[in-house]
A protein has these predicted regions:
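Structural motif
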Residues: 3, 69-70, 98
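N-terminal Rossmann NAD(P)H-binding glycine-rich loop of SDR-like oxidoreductase domains
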Residues: 4-24
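Active-site-lining helix/loop region of Rossmann-like oxidoreductase modules
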Residues: 7-12, 127-128, 139, 145, ...
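Residues in the short beta-alpha loop(s) of Rossmann-like NAD(P)-binding domains
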Residues: 10, 35, 105
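Conserved glycine-rich Rossmann-like NAD(P)H-binding loop of the short-chain dehydrogenase/reductase
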Residues: 25-34
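Short, polar loop motifs at secondary-structure junctions
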Residues: 33-38, 150-152
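NAD(P)H-binding glycine-rich loop region in Rossmannoid oxidoreductase-like domains
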Residues: 37-93
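Glycine-/Pro-rich loop/turn segments that contact NAD(P) or position catalytic residues
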Residues: 79-164
Length: 214
């Protein structure tokens, strides 16, 4: 039986992943978040452990990783690079090697055209953290990280997405949280997929200068 550590477990996409893993697998889940009471509804489940902690706290991260098989990070914010360094330090200390890392479109300067220009301005406060995180992970060959770069997120009840590689221009402008969660669940179920890779996720046929709802 595997055990999965989910960092940033309160995030909407992460909660979709949690529910699907509980329904579709026998994996044990360690849910790491700043305020554990936010996910108290999972407390009665014997397969779930709630861990209250700061993503910068290397000692707490190290303790949380002690017996897990896969680390899935859904952290974000302007301090992301600091969080990423803490994750790397904890993984090296515990000998953990498999990481699923939620990044963002633009992390590799891969978004072309007017949408790329718009995206640079729309999330300019956050892109440095995503880009520095990509560099930090690239410098750790012993950590098998699959980085995800989703398009702008929707709450549409659909699973409809395509992937682009790290050397390919990004496609589309949007993707549903359900779609991103679906891909994360596939990686957790089959951790040998997409080793040492960075993948864009988008809904097909959503090209444009910005997401359609803006």
């Amino acid at each position: 039986m595997s055990k999965i550590l989910i960092l940033g477990a309160h995030v909407a996409t992460a909660q979709i992943v949690i529910d699907r893993l509980l329904a579709e697998t026998q994996a044990d889940l360690a849910l790491y978040l700043r305020h554990a009471a936010r996910l108290n509804r999972y407390q009665p489940n014997p397969r779930v452990t709630l861990i209250e902690g700061d993503a910068q706290d290397v000692a707490a991260l190290t303790a949380a990783m002690a017996d897990v098989d896969v680390v899935y990070s859904n952290l974000g914010g302007v301090q992301l690079a600091t969080f990423t360094q803490a994750i790397i330090t904890a993984m090296r200390a515990t000998g953990r090697t498999r990481l699923i890392f939620y990044s963002a479109l633009g992390a590799l300067h891969e978004v072309p055209g007017k949408f790329g220009q718009w995206n640079e301005q729309a999330i300019k406060a956050y892109l440095p953290g995503f880009r520095e995180s990509a560099k930090l992970l690239a410098a750790q060959p012993e950590i098998n990280a699959t980085q995800l770069r989703p398009a702008w997120l929707t709450d549409k009840d659909e699973v409809d997405y395509e992937l682009t590689g790290s050397k390919e221009p990004f496609k589309g402008t949007e993707v549903s949280r359900q779609s991103v969660a679906d891909f994360i669940v596939k990686l957790i179920k089959n951790p040998s997929l997409y080793p040492h890779d960075s993948l864009g996720l988008n809904k097909p046929h959503t090209d444009g200068n910005q997401p359609a709802w803006l």
